[in-house]
Regions:
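Conserved Class I SAM-dependent methyltransferase catalytic core
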Residues: 31, 148-206
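SAM/dcSAM-binding transferase cores
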Residues: 205-255
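Conserved SAM/SAH cofactor-binding pocket of Class I
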Residues: 40-134
């Protein structure tokens, strides 16, 4: 059964939870903490549609749909191999009628593609500038993590084009680029309204930041208490707060 689902030896099938399984590429994008936290942080609108910018394997959209956060999601992905994975993962999990992959550049994504404005856009965008020295042996990973096909400004501008007035853009990003993120959001008329910093341990600096921005909103931001994933060392038991995220699929208890 598993072999029938895999197109090549470079693919694998991984159970995500009791509801979902994920087809992925062995040397490509994997399901990580950032994906789960983004899906948990996204505010639900069960009767509405949403757009994901940079879908990868589709795991964030799949998690949101499995928890009935949205009625339908369009996931934009520039890499053909991953757009194909999104379609196959949607079909595999019985969500083919609710998750659509759009293969293309987010810089050219407009409401003509989505069929109108939406109330929610979310993204785990590339976070390494082209000037960064780090490169990966995998071209797929470079495309996903480096700003080869759009900067955070481009992703914020795309979100703003697609959102109705008062719509929400939710993003997971690197804390060391928080200034650039906030500048990009405000230049796109997206006002940061909620923020949460994620630390591997209480003794570690933050490794992720989650931000919810609202189109056309006034100033004022709510900052959550920090989320510590592990109490002392990475790889051990989760903190009570992190376990609550997995149990409840929500970060509301931190605000």
């Amino acid at each position: 059964m598993t072999d029938d689902l895999l197109k090549s030896a470079d693919e694998r099938l991984t159970p995500i939870n009791e509801r979902l399984s994920l087809l992925s590429r062995r040397r490509g994008l994997t399901f990580g903490t950032d994906s789960y936290l983004l899906a948990a942080f996204v505010r639900a609108n069960p009767s509405g549609d949403a757009v994901e910018l940079g879908g990868g394997t589709g795991v964030v959209s799949l998690l949101c749909l499995a928890r009935e956060k949205f009625a339908r999601i369009l996931s934009a992905e520039i890499q053909p191999e991953y757009a194909d994975l999104i379609r196959r993962n949607a079909a595999l999990n019985g969500l083919g009628d609710r998750l659509t992959a759009w293969e293309g550049d987010v810089r050219s994504l407009t409401v003509d593609v989505t069929g109108g404005e939406v109330r929610a856009v979310f993204s785990n965008p590339p976070y390494l500038p082209m000037s960064a020295g780090f490169t990966n042996d995998s071209d797929e990973m470079n495309t996903a993590r480096r700003e080869e096909n759009g900067t955070i400004r481009d992703f914020a501008a795309a979100a703003s084009r697609l959102l109705c007035w008062g719509g929400l853009f939710t993003v997971v990003y690197r804390p060391d680029r928080l200034t650039e993120l906030f500048t990009a959001l405000r230049d796109a008329r997206l006002e940061p309204k909620k923020m949460l910093l994620v630390h591997p341990t209480p003794a570690s600096p933050p490794s992720l930041v989650l931000v919810e921005a609202k189109k056309g909103a006034g100033e004022g931001i709510r900052i959550a208490r920090p989320l510590f994933i592990y109490p002392d060392r990475p790889g051990g038991a989760y903190t009570a707060d992190m376990q609550a995220v997995y149990d409840d699929f929500s970060l509301a208890h931190l605000f």
